[in-house]
Curated annotation (Swiss-Prot):
Pathway: Nucleotide-sugar biosynthesis; UDP-N-acetyl-alpha-D-glucosamine biosynthesis; N-acetyl-alpha-D-glucosamine 1-phosphate from alpha-D-glucosamine 6-phosphate (route II): step 2/2; Nucleotide-sugar biosynthesis; UDP-N-acetyl-alpha-D-glucosamine biosynthesis; UDP-N-acetyl-alpha-D-glucosamine from N-acetyl-alpha-D-glucosamine 1-phosphate: step 1/1; Bacterial outer membrane biogenesis; LPS lipid A biosynthesis. Disulfide bonds: none annotated. Binds 1 Mg(2+) ion per subunit. Residues 1-226 are annotated as: Pyrophosphorylase. Its EC number is 2.7.7.23, 2.3.1.157. Catalyzes the last two sequential reactions in the de novo biosynthetic pathway for UDP-N-acetylglucosamine (UDP-GlcNAc). The C-terminal domain catalyzes the transfer of acetyl group from acetyl coenzyme A to glucosamine-1-phosphate (GlcN-1-P) to produce N-acetylglucosamine-1-phosphate (GlcNAc-1-P), which is converted into UDP-GlcNAc by the transfer of uridine 5-monophosphate (from uridine 5-triphosphate), a reaction catalyzed by the N-terminal domain. The gene is glmU. The keyword Magnesium applies. Acetyl-CoA binds at A376, N382, Y383, A419, R436. In the N-terminal section; belongs to the N-acetylglucosamine-1-phosphate uridyltransferase family. In the C-terminal section; belongs to the transferase hexapeptide repeat family. This is Bifunctional protein GlmU.
Length: 453
C-alpha cells in the first residue's frame, strides 16, 4: 500500500507570476497534473496535495480529478515542515509514502515504479532518487557506500572542494516507510540559515536509506523560472516527437513543430513546418497537416489535408481539404470529402459530405446537406443583436456569389440562389431564388452630372 504526497505549496517567486508555480502549463497539462499523472501506474491508495500559496486556486484547478486530498501548509517553512502537516492525515497508515515535488513534471511512471519496487524489496526506511549531473552546481550531493546505502547528504553551499567533485545529486523524490518517518518528523529542526525544516534531515535518523539512480537525469528537471519551463518543454517535445516518428509519423522540420502529449496520431501522418497540435486532438492515417497550421481539441479523419489553417473544438471527416487560411471553430462538423477553402470561417455548423465552401465565406450556426456548393462571399447572418439563429441549406443546393442568408431561414433541396441575393424567407425544393434589386441603367448619367456643375 502506497500513499503519494505532492508538495505544491510554494509561490515560485522566480516565475514572476500571479499564478502559483505548479499551475503553469507544460504541454497539455499543468505541472502538478503531470506529477499526478506520473504516479497513477502505482495505483496509490491515497493522494495528498500539500497546498499553500493560492491554495484554493490549486484546489479548483484539480477538482475534476477524483480521490485527491488537500492538506494546507499555512506557512511555507520548508519541505520537512510540509510533510509534518501529513501527521494527522496519515495517522494509523501502515504503508509507504512517496514524496513528489509539484514542480518536477518530467518523471516517467516506470521510474517511480522502479523506485518503489527497490524500496519494498530491500525493506528500506527511506529510498531516494538520485542522478549524476554533468553540472551539479546548486544541488545537494549524496554520498553512499558500496551498497548504495546513503551515508551523507550535503547541500551544495556546505560542500568543501573535495565533496563538490561528487556529481551524484539528490533528486528530491523520496519513498519512506511512513511509520518510521512519522516517528522522526518531530525531531526536525529549523536551526539553519534559512530557518526551514529540511526533509533531507530525516536521513540521519533513519536506516537503512538507499539511493537509486534515475536512468535519464533530465527526468528530475525542476521548474523554478520561465527559462527552466522552456527547457522542460523542449525535453517533453523531444520525447513526444521521438515517440511519434518511431510510430510511423513524418515530421518535416521537428524543431518548428509542437505536439502535446495528449495528441493521438495514426501512421503515415505528415506534419509540415510551423504546425502545432494541442489538447485532445486526434489525427487519422495519411493526413497531411501544414505548413503553418494550429489544431486544438479536434478530430481529423483519414487522408485530410490542412494548409495554413486554424481548427479548434471541431471535427473534420476523412478525405477533406481545408485551407489555405480557413478557420473552423465552436464544434464545426465537416463531413467526408468536403472542401473548405481560402478565407472561410465556419462556426458551430454541420456540413455534410461532398460539399464545397471554397472561398471567402462565413457560415455560423448553419446546417448544410450533402453536395452543397457555396459560392464565393456567402454569409449566414445568424445574429439579430439578441440571439443566434440557424440557417438550413438542403442537399444539392447551389448558392451564388455574394449571397446573404438572414437567419432563421431554410432552403430546401436542389435550390439555386442567384448571385447577390439577400434571402430572408424560406425557399422550397428545386426553386430559383432571386432576392436582389433589379438592375437599372440610366444612360448619359455622366452628362447629367456635368451639366449641374
Amino acid at each position: 500500500m502506497v500513499a503519494v504526497a505532492i508538495l505544491a505549496a510554494g509561490r515560485g517567486t522566480r516565475m514572476k507570476s500571479n499564478l502559483p508555480k505548479v499551475l503553469h502549463r507544460l504541454g497539455g497539462y499543468s505541472l502538478v497534473e503531470r506529477v499526478l499523472n506520473s504516479c497513477q501506474l502505482l495505483n496509490p491508495s491515497r493522494q495528498l496535495v500539500i497546498i499553500g500559496y493560492e491554495g484554493e486556486q490549486v484546489r479548483d484547478s484539480l477538482q475534476q480529478l477524483d480521490s485527491l486530498e488537500f492538506v494546507e501548509q499555512k506557512e511555507q517553512l520548508g519541505t520537512g515542515h510540509a510533510i509534518q502537516q501529513l501527521l494527522p492525515h496519515l495517522e494509523g497508515f501502515q504503508g509507504d509514502l512517496l514524496v513528489l515535488n509539484g514542480d518536477v513534471p518530467l518523471l516517467r511512471p516506470q521510474t517511480l515504479e522502479n523506485l518503489l519496487n527497490i524500496h519494498k524489496t530491500h525493506r528500506n526506511a527511506a529510498t531516494l532518487l538520485t542522478a549524476h549531473l554533468p553540472n551539479p552546481k546548486g544541488y545537494g550531493r549524496v554520498f553512499c557506500d558500496n551498497n548504495n546505502l546513503v551515508t551523507q547528504i550535503v547541500e551544495d553551499r556546505d560542500c568543501n572542494a573535495a565533496q563538490k567533485q561528487n556529481h551524484r545529486i539528490n533528486g528530491g523524490i523520496y519513498c519512506f516507510n511512513w511509520q518510521q518517518l512519522a516517528a522522526v518528523l518531530p525531531k526536525l529542526s529549523a536551526d539553519n540559515d534559512q530557518k526551514e525544516y529540511y526533509l533531507t534531515d530525516v536521513v540521519k535518523f533513519l536506516a537503512p536509506v538507499m539511493a537509486v539512480d534515475v536512468e535519464d537525469y533530465l527526468e528530475i528537471t525542476g521548474i523554478n523560472d520561465r527559462k527552466q519551463l522552456a527547457m522542460a518543454n523542449g525535453i517533453l517535445q523531444n520525447r513526444v516527437k521521438d515517440h511519434w516518428m518511431a510510430q510511423g509519423v513524418t515530421l518535416i522540420d521537428p524543431d518548428s513543430i509542437t505536439i502535446d502529449d495528449t495528441v493521438e496520431l495514426q501512421t503515415d501522418v505528415i506534419i509540415e513546418p510551423q504546425t502545432h497540435l494541442r489538447g485532445k486532438t486526434s489525427i487519422g492515417k495519411g493526413s497531411r497537416l501544414g505548413p503553418g497550421s494550429l489544431i486544438e481539441n479536434s478530430h481529423i479523419g483519414d487522408n485530410v489535408t490542412v494548409l495554413y489553417s486554424v481548427i479548434t473544438e471541431s471535427q473534420v471527416a476523412s478525405g477533406c481539404r481545408v485551407g489555405p487560411y480557413s478557420h473552423l471553430r465552436g464544434q464545426a462538423q465537416i463531413g467526408e470529402s468536403c472542401r473548405i477553402g481560402n478565407f472561410v470561417e465556419i462556426k458551430k455548423s454541420v456540413i455534410e459530405q461532398k460539399s464545397n465552401v471554397a472561398h471567402l465565406s462565413y457560415l455560423g450556426d448553419a446546417t448544410l446537406g450533402e453536395q452543397v456548393n457555396v459560392g464565393a462571399g456567402t454569409i449566414t447572418a445568424n445574429y439579430d443583436g439578441v440571439q443566434k439563429h440557424r440557417t438550413i441549406i438542403g442537399k444539392g443546393t447551389k448558392t451564388g456569389a455574394n449571397s446573404v442568408f438572414v437567419a432563421p431561414v431554410t432552403l430546401g433541396e436542389e435550390v439555386t440562389v442567384a448571385a447577390g441575393s439577400v434571402v430572408t424567407h424560406d425557399v422550397p425544393d428545386r426553386a430559383l431564388v432571386i432576392a436582389r434589386q433589379r438592375q437599372r441603367i440610366i444612360e448619359e448619367w455622366k452628362k447629367t452630372i456635368e451639366s449641374k456643375k
